[in-house]
Amino acid sequence: MSYLILVRHGQSVWNLENRFTGWVDVDLNENGRTQAKKAGELIKQKQINIDLYYSSFQLRAKNTLKIIQEKLDDFKDVQSAWQLNERHYGSLTGLNKDEMKQKLGEDKVHQFRRSWDLRPDPLDKSSSYHPLNINTYKSIPADKIPDTESLKDTYERVIKFYNEEIEVNIKNKNILISAHGNSIRALCKYLFNLDNQEISKLEIPTGNPLLMKFNDKNKLLNSEYLDSERAKDLLVY
């Protein structure tokens, strides 16, 4: 028996401002830090010893995990992976979602956010929001850095990393991943075998741990959000 815990970072500054964030390295706000503390407390109540910790490269995920580890009093090394980063929103990066609905129409913005293979226009490489211009990503080969992504693109990079680095350890280790709405949606699509319509409806809450239990043959047995009150309207498979 083993466990996988997926945690979307706590609320960020740009989450509150309702902006497309993507690969921009925005930190948690005060509510996000509170959510991360609560996540740590909920995980601690389960008395699960975490063997491996993973995070994206992004500050909001790293700091969420740091707060969780403080609550667990467990400071094992964290493996940071850019492959777990949020989806890159291309030219939408930094823009307010409600303003874009007024400009492009609600249906178009919904398609950009939830369709499987639609990419926004690429982000100009001269933009300060482009990953090539953000110090966080200087260690990543330039040809690996996207300037826009669909959910399908995000799924492919996340699941490739999961298959190569994480899945091999599920059988005998408990693992916690701190990541993002779309990278966790990608993992849920894979682990719950969701189709493209189902994944478009899946909401991932900030700072609410999703606990998955596996048997010794790597079969997913069940899953639950640890903050059940905040998860009462969410789909859990």
Question: Which sequence ranges carry the predicted segments?
Answer:
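Extreme N-terminal starter segment of soluble prokaryotic enzymes
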Residues: M1-I5
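Metal-dependent active-site segment of extracytoplasmic phospho-/sulfohydrolases and closely related
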Residues: N174-L176
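Phosphate-coordination/substrate-recognition cap region in phosphate-metabolizing enzymes
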Residues: A39-H130, Y137-S139, K189-K213, L220, ...
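Active-site glycine-centered loops adjacent to acidic/histidine catalytic or metal-binding residues
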Residues: H9, Q83, H180
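Phosphate/ATP-binding catalytic cores across multiple sugar-kinase/actin-like superfamilies
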Residues: R157-N169
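Loop-to-helix element that buttresses phosphate recognition and phosphoryl-transfer chemistry
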Residues: Q11-Q69, Q79, A142-K160, K201
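Acidic, His/Gly-rich catalytic cores of divalent-metal-dependent hydrolytic chemistry
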Residues: D227-Y237
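GST superfamily/GST-like fold recognition
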Residues: G181-A186
